[in-house]
Amino acid sequence: MSLEITPQLREELRSHFPALATGTVYLENAGGSQVPVQVADRIRDYLLESYVQLGAGYGLSKRSTELVHQAHSLVRLLMGGKENEGEVILGSSASSLLQMLSDCYSRVLQAGQEVIVAETGHEANVGPWTRLDRHGVETRWWRMNPEDFSCSLDQLEDLLSDRTALVAFPHVSNLLGEIVDIRQITTLVHEAGARVVADGVAFAPHRAMRVSEWGVDWYVYSTYKVYGPHMAALWGRSDALGELTGPNHYFIRDVPYQFELGGPSHEGCAGLLGLSDYLEKVVGVEEGSLGRSDIDRAFEIMAACEQPVQSRLLEYLCSREDVRIVGPEVDGPARVGTISFVHADKSSQAITEVVDRTEIGIRHGHMYAYRLCEALDLAPEDGVVRVSLVHYNTPDEIERLIEVLDQALA
């Protein structure tokens, strides 16, 4: 169902983000989004009024303990995980959570078993798995086709065997910007008796997550790229969690705390709850009433805000013969607003240096998809120019960027 996104709605949503009034145009959102005032207020209030340790018997400690529990429950709701199917593990970053997960697997996998790793991945979901080779676990590469930037299911099927322990891949490449068919991949992997580790960091800002519906075993995203504090969340299916022992103190057996070494940021958990306040504003429901259908609706609205903006940028880049888009050139439901390109003659660094002077935030480089840049024959340090949009970006901001790119690309 198409939604009409009016200028008034855009301004209403933007009004919740104080940083958007500073004069900087934020088009580097794949590196980290801005936060709404509701998130910042929750963090401030917690630090000033509730900054105590958890697990004690007095009232304020009990309330803080419940707040951290509520944050886990909210993130599970955001990720679309059914309550009896899995748990949410909170941590400082997707990189740290995936390294923790790999370390846990290193204690149960056997020499000669294999992990399949997608070449299109962010290093956070690549390096931890390739390093299992020190334990005799072999890496099989799910290679990208440089013609269409895809990792084919036929190739995956050929790679899978009775030695496959798990398959690690991005739901959306943070450089290419295309949504893959996660359910189809998961079905294929499960038929081979292996586990799925999906990196949803570049997907989560743009669409609603549905981990139970997809059937994934592990799914990670960064909360600071979805309008929240600098944290990350890893959802684990119950049977997958049951195969592992977490790294926390030996006497901590409760899940998820067994996997949260040192515990999550308490003020960060408060900030996560502030995101529910913002999403309630997006869909216009009463405070404290956010449900799963509201989350779905909020992300439908946000995707509808993004679509004309990313479509205009793709149209502009496609119109230039001196530019090659690294990723799908055609807009559509499987395309998010993370758009990368290279120039026929100019370095990516030279282009971004021109744009930087105009207080428009974009980025160049490998975006931590270092191996993907190598596979594309791009010098990783120069890499691509990446423009990454989210729902609070406007058509006027893109026109401003295009005006600057006309100069930078000339």
Tell me the role of every PLM-derived stretch.
Residues 1-410:
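Pyridoxal 5′-phosphate
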